[in-house]
Amino acid sequence: METVAMKQVYRFKVALKHRRRLWRRIEIEGAQTLGDLDRTIREAFKHDLWDHLSEFFWGRVWKSKGLGEIYPGGGGSGAKKRIDSLGLSEGDRMEYVYDFGDDIQHIVTLEKVIEAEEVAKHTRIISQNKPKYSYCEVCEKLGKKMVATWVCIECSNETQRDVLVCEDCLMKEHDDHYAEEMLY
């Protein structure tokens, strides 16, 4: 009788440290690396993939031992560390910082280690928070309810409040402004 080698899959809940209602649940094989987890977190939270350093920490960001910098292209001293070599147990927590300048911090909690014969595409985002949508302020003035998908940074800086707009209104009224996509 042939035995099937079981693969370990690590299930993490990753939340923005200062907006914990924004979270993603991510599964990754133990044989994959912190570089792979970094890329999935960047994709899940709409962080850019081509710029900015990141790093995982055993405790609080900047106050505890870091696991090595990860460069956007996947290099760096922390990028090749395998998930299954970290000695993690269910409930363990790390912190992750994306962009050392803007200091966007995340809480990374290991929820479960699963033994799996067949492993789906990994890494993968398996769930996320229920979105609490905001609406486009231009459309609201016209009596329409359109979900805002962009923050006009230029207008927000001028008015000292978030100026939230949908895709259409961004193109019509803010096309030459710097804007950032919203995260729900």
Which sequence ranges carry the predicted segments?
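Short linear regulatory motifs enriched in tryptophan with gly/pro/ser
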Residues: M1-Y184
